[in-house]
């Protein structure tokens, strides 16, 4: 489940019309959401609040062998007025990311009026509106500031600076600083990661630099098909999308070189929609070739190749129904002949509310029958709130993941009253993660076999619960 600050950053991207999915780093996001989800560790409590449309806070308290926590603050120059912040109102599908339907590429919005990086920082000029009145123009570009302090020592500070330079460019600066041991006089270790993103809808480029080993990087993604910046007059809906991308890294300090390339084929929403029966003859002729569904179920295929290490990975994700999705991944290394196979699924469940009483029954009909009174027109009861919101409040999702070594991971995420709860467990002969508490719990078992596991190892790798509340 996404943290509250990650959810606010996602809302910031939507408010500024920035497509985060049109990036090579999100090429396999669908399979990762279904196969690489993490389970909570022990007990963790999150308290968050969007105090104003521009300012948000979040506090975390957890027990992972010892008491730890974090304090996080976020400021946005873009007002997030339409962003639900209460944990009882946030759509669970925005927090529990599952199957991600790829959307058709769109052209960037060009009406922001941005000219340069520092243009308009302190300006308070006004521009005329349609009715002749003057409205204050955007004096500052869309900017987001986020800082998180992790406690107790060794204290770690994570900071993020996000700024929209132009409708097609975005600058991101991330800082990580860790304080040394209390008795150490050395300076805190710090690293800076800068990223400049350029997205035109048709293609995207990302340029990265990290002070850690002076690492330079580039990522690019190309979408085949028509350019959304030059739309046709009567375009037919696109049924599928083929994207190709690559990334490359180089460090002159450590002589580190890395690269990978990948392909993604995904059906678009129009591929599973039946053409309208009320369309005219001419439109029917047009849609006979372009509007016919090519698939009953939305699916996504990816292929990623890392030439230097000889790794090949393929994924196949399928949404069998609006509440059920499957995914699988197969990896192979041509140098070591090692392989990996992972399968997973997610199941969404909605607990329907009981149907409201009939309109002509005011709840007193039983009393009238007892008193043998004549039927009188009933007073229509107050209309109950929308059942759509209630369904959203009672949503829950169950995720299951298993690999070829029979390591099983279970995760349940749902809403209990006004709380967002995540509960997970890991089972298998080997641990999913190298967390310290899992290693300590295994060592504390005295080398006994538990649950049929291998001698000297524990089959039960841990269970955790995370509780979140936001206002």
UniProtKB/Swiss-Prot annotation:
Q: Which GO terms describe its cellular component?
A: ERMES complex; SAM complex
Low complexity: which segments have biased composition? 276-288
| Pfam families in alphabetical order | MDM10
* Membrane topology designation: Multi-pass membrane protein
According to its UniProt record, where is this protein located?
Mitochondrion outer membrane
Composition skew (Gly residues), residue ranges = 444-455
Q: Which domain of life is it from?
A: Eukaryota
Its BP terms in the Gene Ontology are: establishment of mitochondrion localization; mitochondrial genome maintenance; mitochondrial outer membrane translocase complex assembly; mitochondrion-endoplasmic reticulum membrane tethering; phospholipid transport; protein insertion into mitochondrial outer membrane
Q: What's the chief localization of this chain?
A: mitochondrion
Region of interest called Disordered, as start-end residue ranges on this chain: 272-291, 374-394, 436-455
Does the keyword Ribonucleoprotein belong to this entry? no
Record keywords: Metal-binding included? no
**InterPro entries listed in its UniProt record:** Mdm10 (IPR027539)
**Which keywords belong to this entry?**
Membrane, Mitochondrion, Mitochondrion outer membrane, Transmembrane, Transmembrane beta strand
| Family named by the database record | Belongs to the MDM10 family.
Summary of subunit composition and partner proteins: Component of the ER-mitochondria encounter structure (ERMES) or MDM complex, composed of mmm1, mdm10, mdm12 and mdm34. Associates with the mitochondrial outer membrane sorting assembly machinery SAM(core) complex.
Stated role: Component of the ERMES/MDM complex, which serves as a molecular tether to connect the endoplasmic reticulum and mitochondria. Components of this complex are involved in the control of mitochondrial shape and protein biogenesis and may function in phospholipid exchange. mdm10 is involved in the late assembly steps of the general translocase of the mitochondrial outer membrane (TOM complex). Functions in the tom40-specific route of the assembly of outer membrane beta-barrel proteins, including the association of tom40 with the receptor tom22 and small TOM proteins.
Q: What is recorded about the domains? A: Lacks alpha-helical transmembrane segments, suggesting that it resides in the membrane via beta-sheet conformations similar to those predicted for other outer membrane proteins and porin.
What is this protein's name?
Mitochondrial distribution and morphology protein 10
